[in-house]
């Protein structure tokens, strides 16, 4: 008799996706982050659901409802801190997953990559609207500053901002709709994840060498299920250490004060995972220019397949491209640091240099390195 997992209409799909899936035999720990992101998403949806049971999306009670969750709800403090720090783990895994894709040339699976970029934008939007919900000082002013950026759009900007606000300032209507968006977006993300996996399973996984692995495949289970389980345990350990020992390490102290529309906080800054983009936004003195640079800093990922000039897919055997990749990583860390600093010298000039070099590395230097490596590998006799 044929195994049920191979014949049952639903189990057959699960079997082909997670059990009998042919996977390259040489994929490293850098391929763990996809499954970790799936677990992060599940965890965020579950903790978020329990938080939504006790949260009230009203300017008068939002802040105190979060305090009530932490003080009076059974394990409410744990659920809230897991949700807040879970977002940080989510972005940590996202950035490493994207970095892996760039290093090993996974972006050449264009459909999978493009859905991935859309996923990144959707997750960023979800995190932004979620940060507004506790209705602390940084929530309120962050919402005001970021939504105000849309006013840079010619002709329709101001109307668009007021339409998003639901009035003439960030108020009750804004909070209510942001809660609605924050609730629905994770389910849209889940649907996009399924499309992402659908396209990935059309081609199969890439591998560190970048060479077609069809001649040497192994089943996903038990080899990669056990490997993913190890990655999961390490991630959960990190998350629990963060949540139980220093839950507020990545939070802004200003957000522990209720929103005061009349009192401006000394420095407006987003969560750490948005700081690199915020630094690029601030490095351009012109408002519209800053908004366009902010968009370009993420959307440039869509151009990665077009900017690939090397004859080899992966950077595994390309030392010049490797060097540029790690310079780009360091550059992003500098931008993250600058995003959290006040707008004054020397931070302003460092941010401007880092912003220019970010685009220069991706658009000019990395494609040039690809051409140069191709030339160096040509026989000269």
Swiss-Prot record:
- Positions of heme b b566 binding: 97, 196
Q: How does it sit in the membrane?
A: Multi-pass membrane protein
Annotated residues that bind a ubiquinone are located at 201
Task: Enumerate the Gene Ontology biological process terms.
Answer: mitochondrial electron transport, ubiquinol to cytochrome c
Cell location:
Mitochondrion inner membrane
Q: Which PROSITE patterns match?
A: CYTB_CTER, CYTB_NTER
InterPro entries annotated for this entry? Cyt_b/b6_C, Cyt_b/b6_C_sf, Cyt_b/b6_N, Cytb/b6-like_sf, Cytochrome_b, Cytochrome_b_C_euk/bac, Cytochrome_b_N_euk/bac, Di-haem_cyt_TM
Q: Which residues bind heme b b562?
A: 83, 182
GO CC term, one of those recorded: mitochondrial inner membrane
Q: Pfam families from the xrefs?
A: Cytochrom_B_C, Cytochrome_B
> Which key words are in the record?
Electron transport, Heme, Iron, Membrane, Metal-binding, Mitochondrion, Mitochondrion inner membrane, Respiratory chain, Transmembrane, Transmembrane helix, Transport, Ubiquinone
One Gene Ontology molecular-function label: metal ion binding
Domain of life of the organism encoding this protein: Eukaryota
Required cofactor names: heme b
Q: How is the cofactor bound?
A: Binds 2 heme b groups non-covalently.
Identify the main location.
Answer: mitochondrion
**What PANTHER family has UniProt attached to this entry?**
CYTOCHROME B
What task does this protein carry out?
Component of the ubiquinol-cytochrome c reductase complex (complex III or cytochrome b-c1 complex) that is part of the mitochondrial respiratory chain. The b-c1 complex mediates electron transfer from ubiquinol to cytochrome c. Contributes to the generation of a proton gradient across the mitochondrial membrane that is then used for ATP synthesis.
Give the protein family.
Belongs to the cytochrome b family.
Q: What else is known?
A: Heme 1 (or BL or b562) is low-potential and absorbs at about 562 nm, and heme 2 (or BH or b566) is high-potential and absorbs at about 566 nm.
Describe its assembly.
Answer: The cytochrome bc1 complex contains 11 subunits: 3 respiratory subunits (MT-CYB, CYC1 and UQCRFS1), 2 core proteins (UQCRC1 and UQCRC2) and 6 low-molecular weight proteins (UQCRH/QCR6, UQCRB/QCR7, UQCRQ/QCR8, UQCR10/QCR9, UQCR11/QCR10 and a cleavage product of UQCRFS1). This cytochrome bc1 complex then forms a dimer.
Under what name is this protein listed?
A: Cytochrome b
Its lineage reads: Eukaryota, Metazoa, Chordata, Craniata, Vertebrata
